Amino acid sequence: MEKTRFQRTAYHGKSNNVVVGLNWSFQGTRLGARTMSALPYIRVVTQVVQKLFPEFAYTTISTNRDFPGYLHIDGKNVGPSVMLTVGEAITGGELWYDGKVIPTAGMAICFDGNNPHMTLPYSTWSQVPHLLPKLLHIGTRVGD
């Protein structure tokens, strides 16, 4: 899928993306720079993912805040993706996948990120750190 100019520059502005775990770079696969400082966060997310999807294996956690959610295909996924949506007073933000709109608020969704998908427009997103305890009570929805 060819990226438009908007898609290539979508991370600029006020969006915030933090990636921890194993990352690919031109120097090969390596542990991300922020990984060691994010261990408490990684432990909580790992606990939630293992509880909801015991067979799911992953190497990287990407946390997005104010992400524009354009239509895209995840570039380096080997298998499925899990999307955890956490926030307060969220309106919108559903996942568009395979021609369907899938509600995401307070949910964990498993889907194939190698297929086109996007986050629909949303408003009022909360900072993640004080919401981590809410992750332990998140529900699941599995995309077809």
Regions found by a protein language model. Give the residues of each.
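Fe(II)/2-oxoglutarate oxygenase catalytic core
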Residues: 1-110, 114-144
